Swiss-Prot record:
Subunit architecture: PSII is composed of 1 copy each of membrane proteins PsbA, PsbB, PsbC, PsbD, PsbE, PsbF, PsbH, PsbI, PsbJ, PsbK, PsbL, PsbM, PsbT, PsbX, PsbY, PsbZ, Psb30/Ycf12, at least 3 peripheral proteins of the oxygen-evolving complex and a large number of cofactors. It forms dimeric complexes.
Annotated positions binding chlorophyll a PD2: 198
Membrane topology, record value: Multi-pass membrane protein
The protein's name in its UniProt record: Photosystem II D2 protein
Residues binding a plastoquinone: 215, 262
Described purpose of this protein according to its UniProt entry: Photosystem II (PSII) is a light-driven water:plastoquinone oxidoreductase that uses light energy to abstract electrons from H(2)O, generating O(2) and a proton gradient subsequently used for ATP formation. It consists of a core antenna complex that captures photons, and an electron transfer chain that converts photonic excitation into a charge separation. The D1/D2 (PsbA/PsbD) reaction center heterodimer binds P680, the primary electron donor of PSII as well as several subsequent electron acceptors. D2 is needed for assembly of a stable PSII complex.
Modified sites of kind N-acetylthreonine: 2
Location of Phosphothreonine modifications: 2
Transmembrane segments: 41-61, 125-141, 153-166, 208-228, 279-295
Protein backbone atom coordinates (compact mmCIF):
# COMPACT_ATOMS: atom_id res chain seq x y z
CA UNK A 1 0.00 0.00 0.00
CA UNK A 2 1.46 3.32 -1.04
CA UNK A 3 0.65 6.59 0.75
CA UNK A 4 1.44 9.82 -1.08
CA UNK A 5 2.21 12.80 1.15
CA UNK A 6 2.01 16.26 -0.31
CA UNK A 7 0.16 19.56 -0.33
CA UNK A 8 -3.26 19.42 -1.89
CA UNK A 9 -3.63 22.11 -4.51
CA UNK A 10 -6.75 23.01 -6.38
CA UNK A 11 -6.47 23.70 -10.06
CA UNK A 12 -8.64 26.77 -9.74
CA UNK A 13 -9.51 28.92 -6.74
CA UNK A 14 -13.19 29.07 -5.91
CA UNK A 15 -15.12 32.27 -5.27
CA UNK A 16 -14.57 32.11 -1.51
CA UNK A 17 -10.78 31.97 -1.91
CA UNK A 18 -10.82 34.86 -4.37
CA UNK A 19 -12.91 37.00 -2.00
CA UNK A 20 -10.83 35.99 1.01
CA UNK A 21 -7.64 36.96 -0.81
CA UNK A 22 -9.02 40.37 -1.76
CA UNK A 23 -10.70 41.16 1.57
CA UNK A 24 -7.71 40.20 3.72
CA UNK A 25 -5.06 41.73 1.49
CA UNK A 26 -2.50 43.98 3.19
CA UNK A 27 -3.58 47.53 2.41
CA UNK A 28 -3.65 50.95 4.10
CA UNK A 29 -7.17 50.38 5.45
CA UNK A 30 -7.84 46.73 6.26
CA UNK A 31 -11.21 45.53 4.97
CA UNK A 32 -11.61 41.90 5.98
CA UNK A 33 -14.79 39.88 6.18
CA UNK A 34 -15.90 42.03 9.10
CA UNK A 35 -15.67 45.06 6.82
CA UNK A 36 -18.60 43.74 4.80
CA UNK A 37 -20.72 44.43 7.89
CA UNK A 38 -18.83 47.36 9.40
CA UNK A 39 -18.34 49.77 6.50
CA UNK A 40 -21.85 49.77 4.98
CA UNK A 41 -23.56 49.92 8.39
CA UNK A 42 -21.27 52.67 9.71
CA UNK A 43 -21.72 54.65 6.49
CA UNK A 44 -25.51 54.43 6.62
CA UNK A 45 -25.68 55.17 10.37
CA UNK A 46 -23.47 58.27 10.17
CA UNK A 47 -25.06 59.39 6.91
CA UNK A 48 -28.56 58.95 8.32
CA UNK A 49 -27.62 60.98 11.40
CA UNK A 50 -26.21 63.86 9.33
CA UNK A 51 -29.26 63.79 7.07
CA UNK A 52 -31.68 63.83 9.99
CA UNK A 53 -29.95 66.55 11.99
CA UNK A 54 -29.66 68.73 8.89
CA UNK A 55 -33.10 68.47 7.31
CA UNK A 56 -35.66 66.41 9.27
CA UNK A 57 -38.14 67.88 11.75
CA UNK A 58 -39.51 66.22 14.89
CA UNK A 59 -42.74 68.18 14.76
CA UNK A 60 -44.84 65.14 13.85
CA UNK A 61 -43.35 62.86 16.52
CA UNK A 62 -42.42 65.11 19.46
CA UNK A 63 -43.77 68.54 18.56
CA UNK A 64 -40.20 69.84 18.40
CA UNK A 65 -37.77 71.47 16.01
CA UNK A 66 -34.69 69.27 15.72
CA UNK A 67 -32.75 70.18 12.56
CA UNK A 68 -30.32 72.83 11.38
CA UNK A 69 -32.89 73.78 8.77
CA UNK A 70 -35.28 74.80 11.56
CA UNK A 71 -32.68 76.82 13.49
CA UNK A 72 -31.08 74.24 15.79
CA UNK A 73 -27.35 74.12 16.40
CA UNK A 74 -24.98 71.18 16.90
CA UNK A 75 -25.99 70.79 20.56
CA UNK A 76 -29.76 70.96 20.02
CA UNK A 77 -30.20 69.11 16.71
CA UNK A 78 -31.18 65.44 16.87
CA UNK A 79 -32.58 62.46 15.01
CA UNK A 80 -35.72 61.91 17.08
CA UNK A 81 -37.45 58.68 18.01
CA UNK A 82 -40.68 57.68 16.23
CA UNK A 83 -44.08 58.60 17.62
CA UNK A 84 -45.38 56.48 20.50
CA UNK A 85 -48.31 55.34 18.36
CA UNK A 86 -45.89 53.42 16.14
CA UNK A 87 -44.85 51.22 19.08
CA UNK A 88 -42.01 48.87 18.08
CA UNK A 89 -42.46 48.99 14.32
CA UNK A 90 -39.20 48.68 12.37
CA UNK A 91 -40.54 51.53 10.21
CA UNK A 92 -39.16 50.14 6.99
CA UNK A 93 -39.30 52.59 4.10
CA UNK A 94 -41.39 50.10 2.13
CA UNK A 95 -43.50 49.14 5.17
CA UNK A 96 -47.20 49.82 5.74
CA UNK A 97 -46.53 53.09 7.59
CA UNK A 98 -44.47 54.98 5.00
CA UNK A 99 -45.47 52.94 1.91
CA UNK A 100 -42.33 53.93 0.03
CA UNK A 101 -42.80 57.68 0.59
CA UNK A 102 -39.40 58.99 1.78
CA UNK A 103 -40.80 62.29 3.09
CA UNK A 104 -43.49 60.52 5.11
CA UNK A 105 -40.88 58.02 6.36
CA UNK A 106 -38.75 60.88 7.71
CA UNK A 107 -41.78 62.57 9.28
CA UNK A 108 -42.74 59.36 11.11
CA UNK A 109 -39.25 58.95 12.59
CA UNK A 110 -37.98 56.25 10.25
CA UNK A 111 -34.47 57.69 10.36
CA UNK A 112 -34.18 56.83 14.05
CA UNK A 113 -34.71 53.10 13.57
CA UNK A 114 -32.46 53.30 10.50
CA UNK A 115 -29.62 54.92 12.49
CA UNK A 116 -30.12 52.77 15.61
CA UNK A 117 -30.09 49.40 13.83
CA UNK A 118 -27.29 50.25 11.41
CA UNK A 119 -25.34 51.75 14.31
CA UNK A 120 -25.71 48.60 16.41
CA UNK A 121 -24.58 46.34 13.58
CA UNK A 122 -21.77 48.77 12.76
CA UNK A 123 -20.46 48.52 16.33
CA UNK A 124 -20.70 44.74 16.20
CA UNK A 125 -18.81 44.83 12.89
CA UNK A 126 -16.06 46.90 14.52
CA UNK A 127 -15.73 44.33 17.30
CA UNK A 128 -15.56 41.53 14.73
CA UNK A 129 -12.90 43.55 12.91
CA UNK A 130 -10.78 43.47 16.06
CA UNK A 131 -11.30 39.71 16.36
CA UNK A 132 -10.34 39.22 12.72
CA UNK A 133 -7.19 41.33 12.88
CA UNK A 134 -6.14 39.78 16.19
CA UNK A 135 -6.42 36.33 14.63
CA UNK A 136 -4.49 37.45 11.55
CA UNK A 137 -1.49 38.73 13.54
CA UNK A 138 -1.81 36.03 16.23
CA UNK A 139 -2.88 38.27 19.10
CA UNK A 140 -5.28 37.46 21.88
CA UNK A 141 -8.77 38.95 21.40
CA UNK A 142 -8.90 41.17 24.50
CA UNK A 143 -9.41 44.35 22.45
CA UNK A 144 -12.61 42.92 21.02
CA UNK A 145 -13.70 41.73 24.46
CA UNK A 146 -13.10 45.23 25.85
CA UNK A 147 -15.15 46.79 23.05
CA UNK A 148 -18.09 44.59 24.06
CA UNK A 149 -18.64 47.05 26.94
CA UNK A 150 -19.66 50.04 24.78
CA UNK A 151 -21.70 47.70 22.56
CA UNK A 152 -23.59 46.37 25.59
CA UNK A 153 -24.39 49.92 26.74
CA UNK A 154 -25.54 51.02 23.27
CA UNK A 155 -27.75 47.98 22.72
CA UNK A 156 -29.27 48.12 26.21
CA UNK A 157 -30.04 51.86 26.12
CA UNK A 158 -31.13 52.32 22.50
CA UNK A 159 -32.75 48.94 21.79
CA UNK A 160 -33.56 46.83 24.86
CA UNK A 161 -34.91 49.67 27.04
CA UNK A 162 -37.51 50.89 24.51
CA UNK A 163 -38.40 47.26 23.70
CA UNK A 164 -39.36 46.87 27.36
CA UNK A 165 -41.40 50.09 27.24
CA UNK A 166 -44.36 50.91 25.02
CA UNK A 167 -42.32 51.84 21.95
CA UNK A 168 -39.18 53.31 20.39
CA UNK A 169 -40.56 56.70 21.48
CA UNK A 170 -39.01 56.24 24.94
CA UNK A 171 -35.49 55.54 23.64
CA UNK A 172 -32.97 58.40 23.51
CA UNK A 173 -32.99 60.53 20.38
CA UNK A 174 -29.61 60.88 18.67
CA UNK A 175 -28.49 64.33 19.76
CA UNK A 176 -26.60 66.04 22.58
CA UNK A 177 -29.49 67.91 24.25
CA UNK A 178 -31.73 64.91 23.50
CA UNK A 179 -29.43 62.64 25.49
CA UNK A 180 -29.48 65.14 28.37
CA UNK A 181 -33.30 65.03 28.32
CA UNK A 182 -33.15 61.23 28.39
CA UNK A 183 -30.85 61.33 31.43
CA UNK A 184 -33.32 63.58 33.27
CA UNK A 185 -36.12 61.21 32.24
CA UNK A 186 -34.20 58.22 33.62
CA UNK A 187 -33.69 60.00 36.92
CA UNK A 188 -37.24 61.24 37.31
CA UNK A 189 -39.02 58.06 36.27
CA UNK A 190 -36.53 55.39 37.45
CA UNK A 191 -34.43 57.09 40.18
CA UNK A 192 -31.45 55.87 38.15
CA UNK A 193 -28.72 57.49 40.26
CA UNK A 194 -29.71 55.38 43.26
CA UNK A 195 -29.60 52.18 41.22
CA UNK A 196 -26.65 49.96 42.29
CA UNK A 197 -25.90 49.06 38.66
CA UNK A 198 -25.50 52.75 37.86
CA UNK A 199 -23.19 53.08 40.85
CA UNK A 200 -21.05 50.22 39.54
CA UNK A 201 -20.96 51.85 36.12
CA UNK A 202 -19.82 55.18 37.55
CA UNK A 203 -17.18 53.44 39.67
CA UNK A 204 -15.94 51.54 36.61
CA UNK A 205 -15.71 54.50 34.24
CA UNK A 206 -14.27 57.02 36.71
CA UNK A 207 -12.03 54.36 38.25
CA UNK A 208 -10.71 53.53 34.79
CA UNK A 209 -9.98 57.21 34.14
CA UNK A 210 -8.03 57.37 37.41
CA UNK A 211 -6.12 54.18 36.58
CA UNK A 212 -5.32 55.50 33.11
CA UNK A 213 -3.98 58.79 34.49
CA UNK A 214 -1.92 57.05 37.20
CA UNK A 215 -0.52 54.51 34.76
CA UNK A 216 0.50 57.10 32.17
CA UNK A 217 2.08 59.35 34.78
CA UNK A 218 3.95 56.46 36.41
CA UNK A 219 5.44 55.27 33.12
CA UNK A 220 6.52 58.83 32.28
CA UNK A 221 7.99 59.25 35.78
CA UNK A 222 10.12 56.10 35.58
CA UNK A 223 11.72 56.59 32.15
CA UNK A 224 15.40 55.86 32.58
CA UNK A 225 16.91 56.15 29.10
CA UNK A 226 16.87 59.72 27.87
CA UNK A 227 17.39 60.21 24.17
CA UNK A 228 18.74 63.22 22.31
CA UNK A 229 15.31 64.59 21.45
CA UNK A 230 13.94 67.82 22.85
CA UNK A 231 11.02 66.10 24.51
CA UNK A 232 9.65 62.69 25.42
CA UNK A 233 8.02 62.16 22.03
CA UNK A 234 11.22 62.78 20.08
CA UNK A 235 13.55 60.99 22.46
CA UNK A 236 12.63 57.41 21.64
CA UNK A 237 12.39 55.28 18.54
CA UNK A 238 8.84 53.91 18.29
CA UNK A 239 10.17 50.58 17.02
CA UNK A 240 12.77 50.02 19.74
CA UNK A 241 12.79 46.53 21.20
CA UNK A 242 13.81 47.26 24.76
CA UNK A 243 11.76 48.93 27.47
CA UNK A 244 12.83 52.34 28.67
CA UNK A 245 10.92 52.57 31.94
CA UNK A 246 11.40 50.76 35.23
CA UNK A 247 8.62 48.58 36.60
CA UNK A 248 10.74 47.97 39.70
CA UNK A 249 11.00 51.70 40.43
CA UNK A 250 7.28 52.16 39.87
CA UNK A 251 6.52 49.28 42.23
CA UNK A 252 8.77 50.79 44.90
CA UNK A 253 7.11 54.21 44.52
CA UNK A 254 3.50 52.98 44.84
CA UNK A 255 4.43 50.56 47.61
CA UNK A 256 5.55 53.56 49.62
CA UNK A 257 2.46 55.61 48.66
CA UNK A 258 -0.27 53.02 49.27
CA UNK A 259 1.50 50.18 50.99
CA UNK A 260 0.60 47.90 48.07
CA UNK A 261 1.43 48.03 44.37
CA UNK A 262 1.23 45.95 41.21
CA UNK A 263 4.33 43.82 40.80
CA UNK A 264 3.18 42.08 37.63
CA UNK A 265 2.54 43.89 34.35
CA UNK A 266 -0.02 41.36 33.20
CA UNK A 267 -2.13 41.75 36.34
CA UNK A 268 -1.81 45.54 36.18
CA UNK A 269 -3.03 45.77 32.60
CA UNK A 270 -5.73 43.15 33.08
CA UNK A 271 -7.02 45.23 36.00
CA UNK A 272 -7.10 48.31 33.73
CA UNK A 273 -9.15 46.24 31.27
CA UNK A 274 -11.40 44.70 33.90
CA UNK A 275 -12.48 47.87 35.73
CA UNK A 276 -14.07 49.87 32.87
CA UNK A 277 -15.46 46.88 30.96
CA UNK A 278 -17.10 45.45 34.07
CA UNK A 279 -18.52 48.87 34.90
CA UNK A 280 -20.02 49.24 31.43
CA UNK A 281 -21.48 45.74 31.53
CA UNK A 282 -23.02 46.35 34.96
CA UNK A 283 -24.62 49.60 33.82
CA UNK A 284 -25.97 47.81 30.74
CA UNK A 285 -27.52 45.15 32.99
CA UNK A 286 -29.08 47.92 35.06
CA UNK A 287 -30.70 49.44 31.98
CA UNK A 288 -32.10 46.02 31.05
CA UNK A 289 -33.65 46.02 34.52
CA UNK A 290 -35.18 49.44 33.88
CA UNK A 291 -36.64 48.12 30.63
CA UNK A 292 -38.63 45.77 32.86
CA UNK A 293 -39.42 48.66 35.26
CA UNK A 294 -37.43 47.14 38.12
CA UNK A 295 -37.03 49.69 40.89
CA UNK A 296 -33.89 50.95 42.57
CA UNK A 297 -33.54 51.18 46.35
CA UNK A 298 -36.66 52.37 48.16
CA UNK A 299 -36.14 53.63 51.70
CA UNK A 300 -39.82 53.71 52.56
CA UNK A 301 -39.26 54.21 56.30
CA UNK A 302 -37.51 57.52 55.60
CA UNK A 303 -40.30 58.63 53.27
CA UNK A 304 -42.98 57.82 55.88
CA UNK A 305 -41.10 59.61 58.65
CA UNK A 306 -40.47 62.65 56.42
CA UNK A 307 -44.19 62.79 55.62
CA UNK A 308 -45.11 62.66 59.31
CA UNK A 309 -42.34 64.85 60.74
CA UNK A 310 -41.80 68.26 59.07
CA UNK A 311 -38.39 68.56 60.76
CA UNK A 312 -37.09 65.26 59.39
CA UNK A 313 -35.64 65.19 55.89
CA UNK A 314 -32.72 63.36 54.27
CA UNK A 315 -30.94 63.77 50.96
CA UNK A 316 -32.88 60.71 49.82
CA UNK A 317 -36.29 62.22 50.61
CA UNK A 318 -35.28 65.49 48.93
CA UNK A 319 -34.30 63.53 45.82
CA UNK A 320 -37.62 61.68 45.83
CA UNK A 321 -39.42 65.04 45.83
CA UNK A 322 -37.21 66.24 42.98
CA UNK A 323 -38.08 63.10 41.02
CA UNK A 324 -41.78 63.81 41.55
CA UNK A 325 -41.20 67.30 40.22
CA UNK A 326 -39.39 65.97 37.17
CA UNK A 327 -42.26 63.60 36.42
CA UNK A 328 -44.97 66.20 36.90
CA UNK A 329 -43.27 68.91 34.87
CA UNK A 330 -41.76 66.63 32.25
CA UNK A 331 -44.58 64.26 31.40
CA UNK A 332 -46.85 66.85 29.78
CA UNK A 333 -43.97 68.33 27.76
CA UNK A 334 -42.31 65.04 26.92
CA UNK A 335 -45.43 63.08 25.96
CA UNK A 336 -47.70 65.56 24.15
CA UNK A 337 -49.69 62.71 22.62
CA UNK A 338 -51.10 61.86 26.07
CA UNK A 339 -52.70 65.33 26.42
CA UNK A 340 -51.72 65.43 30.08
CA UNK A 341 -52.99 68.47 31.99
CA UNK A 342 -51.90 68.98 35.59
CA UNK A 343 -53.67 71.66 37.67
CA UNK A 344 -51.37 74.21 39.25
CA UNK A 345 -52.21 73.02 42.75
CA UNK A 346 -50.73 69.55 42.14
CA UNK A 347 -47.50 70.75 40.54
CA UNK A 348 -44.66 70.81 43.08
CA UNK A 349 -43.37 74.22 44.06
CA UNK A 350 -40.15 75.01 45.88
CA UNK A 351 -37.27 77.43 46.13
CA UNK A 352 -35.98 76.39 42.70
CA UNK A 353 -39.31 77.03 41.00
Amino acid sequence: MTIALGKFTKDQNDLFDIMDDWLRRDRFVFVGWSGLLLFPCAYFAVGGWFTGTTFVTSWYTHGLASSYLEGCNFLTAAVSTPANSLAHSLLLLWGPEAQGDFTRWCQLGGLWTFVALHGAFGLIGFMLRQFELARSVQLRPYNAIAFSGPIAVFVSVFLIYPLGQSGWFFAPSFGVAAIFRFILFFQGFHNWTLNPFHMMGVAGVLGAALLCAIHGATVENTLFEDGDGANTFRAFNPTQAEETYSMVTANRFWSQIFGVAFSNKRWLHFFMLFVPVTGLWMSALGVVGLALNLRAYDFVSQEIRAAEDPEFETFYTKNILLNEGIRAWMAAQDQPHENLIFPEEVLPRGNAL
